[in-house]
Swiss-Prot record:
HAMAP family: SfsA
Name of the protein this chain belongs to: Sugar fermentation stimulation protein homolog
Gene (UniProt): sfsA
CDD domains per UniProt: SfsA-like_bacterial
Signal sequence annotation: none
GO molecular function terms noted in the UniProt entry: DNA binding
Gene3D superfamilies, per the entry: 2.40.50.580, 3.40.1350.60
Top-level taxonomy: Bacteria, Pseudomonadati, Pseudomonadota, Alphaproteobacteria, Hyphomicrobiales
Organism for this UniProt entry: Bartonella tribocorum (strain CIP 105476 / IBS 506)
A Pfam family of this chain: SfsA
Family: Belongs to the SfsA family.
Length: 238
């Protein structure tokens, strides 16, 4: 996925109210931008961090600039949580998810379960329906190990419960973790920051929910899914 138009460099001053950040450019001009991420962004909000912004000419937007990339630990990290669903389609088209190939129809944002929407519903006359839930990942504490979540997510735990019900009905269900940074070789669930999600994840795997993780190459030109990474179900004291 290419950034069109190109991104603009800036420095982060602070992030606040989840959806906002104050930033400054080289000319020291300070202004407010939108932040397309509802999570904690743990480890990505250091003052004076190098960041990159997209510009949107839509006059209905309150803030014309939007945060897209943060530099952390000498690595570019994508923070826009609306992008992984676009990157999933690229990953499937590029052969990174052969387990999900062969489906003729891919439906987005379909209602299922009791009160949820699935990111993707894959359908084909010759294959069982596959319900695919996608999560954005950017958190790293140990070198090379990406983790999710970086804070408690009751909604995420509910999604795992819904996927287990799908499997019980004889259909396929899968979790796909899109890692918007390149400096990782493995992925794990962050049990210590969200024990409930960790327990639900363990149950989901035992119930037959499939799980995949893909890391992306991040640059100011674009974000591209490039490689599967192994999944290690570690605990925080492992």
């Amino acid at each position: 996925m290419h950034f069109i138009p190109k991104l603009f460099p800036a420095k982060l001053i602070r992030r606040y109210k989840r959806f906002l950040a104050d930033v400054k450019q080289d000319d020291q001009h300070i202004f407010t931008v939108s932040v397309p991420n509802t999570g904690s962004m743990l480890g990505l909000t250091a003052s004076n961090a190098n960041i990159w912004l997209s510009y949107h000419e839509n006059t209905k937007r309150k803030y014309a600039y939007q945060l897209e990339i943060v530099e952390a630990d000498n690595t570019l990290v994508g923070i826009n949580t609306t992008l992984p669903n676009k990157l999933v389609l690229e990953a499937i088209q590029n052969g990174l998810l052969p387990e999900l190939s062969g489906y003729k129809t891919i439906l987005k944002e379909q209602r299922y379960g009791t009160q949820s929407r699935i990111d993707f519903l894959l359908r084909d006359d010759n294959l069982p329906d596959c319900y695919l839930e996608v999560k954005n990942v950017h958190f790293i504490r140990q070198k090379g190990l990406a983790e999710f979540p970086d804070t408690e997510t009751k909604r995420g735990a509910r999604h795992l419960e819904e996927l287990m019900h799908v499997v019980q009905q004889g259909k396929r269900a899968a979790m796909l973790y899109i890692i918007q940074r390149e400096d990782c070789t493995a992925f794990t669930i962050c049990h210590d920051l969200d024990p409930l999600y960790g327990r639900k994840f363990d149950l989901a795997l035992k119930s037959g929910v499939e799980c995949y993780a893909i890391k992306c190459h991040i640059s100011v030109e674009g974000i591209f899914p490039i490689q599967r990474v192994k999944i290690e179900n570690r605990r925080n004291n492992d």
